[in-house]
């Protein structure tokens, strides 16, 4: 089963509440069950998120690059089991951060300490569709 990708721009959400908003979206989607011909289909979501504006050191990133990082975070969420959100919070010391390298492999950059990320998990007891 495939899904659609959506971009939500939420300028009124402060940085310190982004994890909470991701958790609320996960819970809201997880609470949805679709009845198709008497078969209950559970719905889940994978989320990538980041604050905007986002800076590397003192240099503000172009919105296109932020969206690219969010997309990469989304795919990290999908590859690590879905029903979760991966968020980019910021970067290590701006002088040693190479954004081109980070954009090649966000997960490696995160694990090597170049990127500050957060993970928000959905309900682990959520019923999963057989092919999720």
Give, region by region, the residue ranges found by the protein language model:
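Heptad-repeat coiled-coil signal-transmission/dimerization helices
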Residues: 22-23, 67
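Non-catalytic regulatory/interaction regions at protein termini and inter-domain linkers
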Residues: 104-132
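Catalytic-core segments of nucleotide cyclases and related cyclic-nucleotide turnover enzymes
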Residues: 52-86, 93, 97-114
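Catalytic strand-loop-helix junctions within cyclic-nucleotide turnover domains
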Residues: 9-18, 37-40, 46-66, 91-92
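Short glycine- and acidic-residue-rich catalytic loops of nucleotidyl-transferase/cyclase enzymes
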Residues: 1-5
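Catalytic core regions of nucleotide second-messenger enzymes
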Residues: 29-46, 78
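N-terminal sensory regulatory modules of PAS/LOV and PAS-like folds
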Residues: 6, 25, 90
